[in-house]
From Swiss-Prot:
Record keyword Disulfide bond present: no
Transmembrane domains' residue ranges: 46-69, 135-158, 175-199, 273-291, 330-353, 369-395, 417-439, 517-535, 575-596, 643-665, 707-727
UniProt name for this protein: Photosystem I P700 chlorophyll a apoprotein A2
HAMAP family hit by this protein: PSI_PsaB (MF_00482)
Amino acid sequence: MATKFPKFSQALSQDPTTRRIWYGIATAHDFESHDGMTEENLYQKIFASHFGHLAIIFLWTSGNLFHVAWQGNFEQWILNPLKVKPIAHAIWDPHFGQPALKAFSKGGSAYPVNIAYSGVYHWWYTIGMRTNQDLYTGALFLLVLSAILLFGGWLHLQPKFKPGLSWFKNNESRLNHHLSGLFGVSSLAWTGHLVHVAIPESRGQHVGWDNFTTVLPHPAGLQPFFSGNWSVYAQNPDTAQQLFGTNEGAGTAILTFLGGFHPQSQSLWLTDMAHHHLAIAVVFIVAGHMYRTNWGIGHNLKDILDAHRPPSGRLGAGHRGLFDTITNSLHMQLGLALAALGVITSLVAQHMYAMPPYAFMAKDFTTQASLYTHHQYIAGFLMVGAFAHGAIFFVRDYDPEQNKGNVLARMLEHKEAIISHLSWVTLFLGFHTLGLYVHNDTMIAFGTPEKQILIEPVFAQWIQASSGKALYGFDVLLSSSSNIATQAGSNIWLPGWLEAINSGKNSLFLTIGPGDFLVHHAIALGLHTTALILVKGALDARGSKLMPDKKDFGYSFPCDGPGRGGTCDISAWDAFYLAVFWMLNTIGWVTFYWHWKHITIWQGNATQFNESSTYLMGWFRDYLWLNSSPLINGYNPYGMNNLSVWSWMFLFGHLVWATGFMFLISWRGYWQELIETLAWAHERTPLANLIRWKDKPVAMSIVQARLVGLAHFSVGYVLTYAAFVLASTAGKFG
């Protein structure tokens, strides 16, 4: 008899019901729970999967390059990046009638195409790519790299090339190599690319495989480097009149500290970015030589952590025990990595629009909106994942003996204080923010808008002023010409920065008022509520008032409601599940705020946001309803336009989202009855009953139904808003 799926669990493979399939899928990646799994084998499997992951990423990026080179308009776009719409790829659809063919043939193409809103054209242009041939070469290189990585993954599963457990747990070596190699040397290599290829191309000088060894990136060559006269590399930067991609107004500097933006492309100066990457390379290459490995010099991480015990005794055993706890817990490591990556991804969202690094991207408004929304949602999912694995760490890996009295144990000991403080913060923020919004709504409804409670965000304005924004008249720090801070930077980066922050042509430190004050606190409410649910879920994962140790219940024990007392208190999975709703809710507010504020600024109508954002009906009517008109009119009895696809996606997203509730607001009994009724009918229907199955159909578990509901809710939510952002922005600005 052939062994049934799943091969990794004998118990599951012998289950006579459909539970075998669903639990098999659910635990396929939970390597720890597989039959016969050893710690060494676990690490080896995860290590090999990294290669596969990278191979998929490079295959995908190779596909981006290939399709743009084949079906895009990169070379035409370069000639006029502000007017020509970048094409992602062609659309082939046999269902298209003539009106659709006409509507979707845009960006100067003779056939239906998708417009690229990812910013890749701007990126490739900025880093020195100029022809379709460049794109094809890049695609081929990444394809080969992908194949090499796949081979590497396979190779590291072969007995001779499997790393041992001690190799995976050698923290100092890993830190040295990752800091020096992954961050340091790669940043140095990128600096090299910017200096040798991107900067010359931005000045109209071609550098390619044919001449890169002979073209000097700087007229003085390496002489200033070896003589220590490094400032030569910063002399003669590009002028404010430089035309990007030509030598008109171009200088010769390669490493500068100009500050602000290139006036024509409205992106950061390439020479500033090269300098930045060089600095990062130096810092990280040095950092990667700090930890003790084969030669008895450098830091030992265990010694550092064990020494972290403040003499006052207020942190108990301090960081003692953490070295082994973190080294031996993959969930703890993953939680820390996800949290760090989540923060970085959100920072990318913020910096990508406030300080655009790519030429002309600041003027491609739909791309700006897409990239912000995309990165904020990804940050949200990464953050909830961090806490989910934190909770799994407490259930599976936390050893109370090993961590006696240290900071981890103390977090658990005073978790009631942490949770209750978070709870008070959320209650305060929630009632006060909603109270202000509702008061203002009522005043608007009764025709007395002057009675609204409008609070100026004076502290935030003061912070903006201290960074150099002159508008508010706070004579403080960088907004004061006589301040010592202003004088210290006045001959290097400050002139460019101050010009940029006060120019009104970009998104640096946008002017803020009462509407911003309110939505800031609404977002703070969302962030704190999400944090409260996640923190409680993780801290209570192992033990709570009702259940001193929950280790044997596992992470995904179901919350069964008040009928089975206390089950919700012991379900870490349920905290994660609830937190995802709040995370989506919060990022909804964040992206609504960003998008509405920006489209009013881009349209030269900032007053609309300022006046309508102080009450809820303003958000519903003047942001959501007003901007959904292109979606509602995407196709109608009179035909269609090139926003029709987003209209369809808007409907489809709502449908997926609403489907989620079918799984969220129902219990297992209903599904079991439905399944058995369908199975009964199937078995008695001619022709249909030729198809039979051996597994007895069983309704999904409570946790699985919640997961299916949550997945539909999340996917539908994101799809709906994606369609809204794209159609409402592209409908206004093309």
